[in-house]
């Protein structure tokens, strides 16, 4: 399970980094191609992290969450669930942003708003994940 957790982490870091950079470029640069490319990387990394996370979730639920996290640190369990909800909100927004930029629609304000909201959700999810990780770690 350890390699898949590391892969999940690396993909999440790429997703957050690309998401934040796409938001920065959406606000500061008229270069839609770069923003579109970064938004595509963020979407691809988020989807890959989601798939890897879904594959490791059953083991996490049995070995960590039910085994002791829910009893010892219920606040960490709630933070994990909140992180998952933020990611679930960010994914369709990332897809919409990528599609909007890909279609080259003349809606820069919408693209900027989507990029910023998506980046905020991804960063918040990453901070929640880091908080949960400090509570339980991995054996």
Regions found by a protein language model. Name each.
Residues 1-139:
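Polytopic transmembrane helical bundles with strong interfacial aromatic enrichment
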